[in-house]
Design a protein with these regions (language model features):
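N-terminal secretory signal peptides
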Residues: 1-24
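Processing junctions and N-termini across compartments
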Residues: 5-9, 126, 131, 145-147
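N-terminal twin-arginine translocation
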Residues: 23-28, 39-57
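Sec-dependent signal peptide hydrophobic core
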Residues: 33-37
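N-terminal pre-ligand scaffold of iron-sulfur
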Residues: 49-131, 136-141, 182-201
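Acidic, glycine-rich flexible loop segments
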Residues: 133-140, 144-156, 161-174
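Short Fe-S-cluster ligation motifs
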Residues: 158-199
């Protein structure tokens, strides 16, 4: 078949005759617009999950992945620290896409807290980053004898009663604290982390 005998669309280049061009253009525009909207909106949920805790966030147990139920202050018992992630109560988005958002909730007697700690506590509960400041392992082992948190990787030890100060091991700085307040009987984030969470490098 010579070129003159070929019908529109038969040349293999994807061209069409003029009668159908407008219809195809409209469909392409619709598909492109829909794809663009999906791309634009998709990161919003991911961003919310990666964002650091925000004032007004509530907390959910760290093993919950959807349909979060807010942790109540009464659920955090003395000597039994609880791992948690913050979540946005409006969108129900759990901020668990970054492990740097994981916190450990520790219940103490009011008489154990100094003035500075009381300002960041709610019902005797303090929140610390659960991520060691050395190499970003989890500092979650509770030592009741001296009320400290220990990282299982390199034995860095943090004093809960002294704003997470390093008392042993290679960690270069204190555990960040996350100030709390109460909303009814639920624990709520009062302010951002006191310092950025994460390891030294």
């Amino acid at each position: 078949m010579n070129d003159e005998a070929r019908q529109p669309g038969e040349c293999g280049c994807g061209c069409t005759d003029g009668s159908s061009a407008k219809g195809i253009d409209r469909r392409q525009v619709i598909r492109i617009a829909a794809a663009g909207a999906a791309v634009a909106l998709a990161p919003l949920g991911a961003l919310a999950a990666e964002e650091r805790p925000q004032a007004g966030d509530l907390f959910v147990a760290d093993d919950v992945e959807k349909d979060p139920v807010a942790i109540k202050a009464a659920e955090v018992q003395p000597g039994k620290p609880m791992l948690a992630f913050p979540f946005d109560p409006a969108s129900k988005k759990i901020r668990n896409e970054s492990r740097l958002n994981k916190v450990i909730l520790v219940k103490l007697a009011d008489s154990d807290l100094d003035a500075s700690s009381k300002e960041r506590a709610a019902s005797g509960i303090l929140a610390f980053s659960a991520i060691c400041t050395h190499q970003a392992c989890e500092a979650k082992t509770w030592v009741s004898a001296d009320k400290s948190l220990v990282c299982f990787c390199h034995a860095s030890k943090f004093a809960v009663l002294d704003a997470g100060r390093v008392v042993a091991g290679p960690a270069p700085r204190a555990l960040p604290m996350l100030p709390l307040k109460l909303q009814g009987d639920q624990l709520m984030v009062a302010a951002p982390f006191t310092t950025p969470p994460g390891g030294a490098g």
